[in-house]
């Protein structure tokens, strides 16, 4: 695309859309056109081990012509909705690039409001290097946030499942209630938190009987 006068090309991707706790992170990245040996392992971040992502993240930042990461809190997700958070985050991530792109590639996501042409590519994080780089930046940033968050909220195992809806996670919400970092607009969180409230009310009633 750069050779066709549409460059530089930015890739955009998100991490955490399907989680029920913690933020969503959205990254944008512009890579040089030439192959980069240190980034040969780049592919969809979901197909990379945690250790590989950790190694790639500083290398992506080192070689990228420009990169940015936007983090949108669980509170804003509850307030505006995940779709709005995702789309606005992608626009903000592209706008935050030091070098403005002439074209944007997304991982199958339609994003109205870009100031330049864009193309959603199905499976783009596995086929376009700039999207793959963005996916690593987004996921590793979010994983680091969730690992730190586990220190503040140790009951949920956030360092393990990173806020996704595993059985262990939902059982913990039923037992301890949801934390301030949970997405209360998500039905599974609301239901589990309500079950905790109901159990707490029953315990109070029985204790006062």
Swiss-Prot record:
Which positions fall inside the RNase H type-2 domain? 7-198
Q: Which Pfam families match?
A: RNase_HII (PF01351)
Q: Which residues bind a divalent metal cation?
A: 13-14, 107
Q: Which GO terms describe its cellular component?
A: cytoplasm; ribonuclease H2 complex
Top-level taxon: Bacteria
Q: What is its EC number?
A: 3.1.26.4
Predominant location category:
cytoplasm
GO terms, molecular function: manganese ion binding; RNA binding; RNA-DNA hybrid ribonuclease activity
- Would I find NADP among this entry's keywords? no
Keywords for this entry? Cytoplasm, Endonuclease, Hydrolase, Manganese, Metal-binding, Nuclease
Cofactor mode of binding and number, as noted: Manganese or magnesium. Binds 1 divalent metal ion per monomer in the absence of substrate. May bind a second metal ion after substrate binding.
User: Example GO biological process term?
Assistant: mismatch repair
| Named cofactor requirement(s) | Mn(2+); Mg(2+)
Catalytic activity of the protein? Endonucleolytic cleavage to 5'-phosphomonoester
Family per record: Belongs to the RNase HII family.
* HAMAP family with a match to the protein in the record: RNase_HII_B (MF_00052_B)
Q: Quote the protein name from its UniProt record.
A: Ribonuclease HII
Q: Which organism is it from?
A: Corynebacterium glutamicum (strain R)
Q: Top-down, what is the taxonomic lineage of the species of origin?
A: Bacteria, Bacillati, Actinomycetota, Actinomycetes, Mycobacteriales
């Amino acid at each position: 695309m750069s050779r066709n006068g549409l460059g530089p090309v930015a890739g955009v991707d998100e991490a955490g859309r399907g989680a029920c706790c913690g933020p969503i992170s959205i990254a944008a990245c512009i890579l040089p056109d030439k192959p980069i040996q240190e980034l040969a392992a780049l592919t969809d971040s979901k197909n990379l081990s945690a250790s590989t992502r950790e190694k790639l993240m500083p290398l992506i930042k080192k070689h990228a012509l420009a990169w940015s990461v936007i983090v949108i809190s669980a509170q804003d997700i509850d307030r505006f909705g995940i779709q709005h958070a995702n789309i606005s985050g992608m626009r903000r991530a592209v706008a935050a690039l030091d070098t403005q792109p002439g074209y944007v590639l997304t991982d199958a996501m339609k994003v109205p409001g870009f100031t330049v042409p864009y193309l959603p590519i199905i499976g783009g994080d596995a086929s376009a290097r700039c999207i793959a780089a963005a996916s690593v930046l987004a996921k590793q940033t979010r994983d680091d946030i969730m690992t730190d968050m586990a220190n503040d909220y140790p009951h949920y195992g956030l360092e393990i499942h990173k806020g996704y809806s595993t059985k262990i996670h939902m059982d913990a919400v039923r037992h301890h209630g949801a934390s301030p970092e949970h997405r209360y607009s998500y039905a599974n969180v609301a239901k589990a938190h309500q079950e905790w409230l109901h159990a707490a009310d029953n315990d109070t009633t029985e204790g006062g009987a």
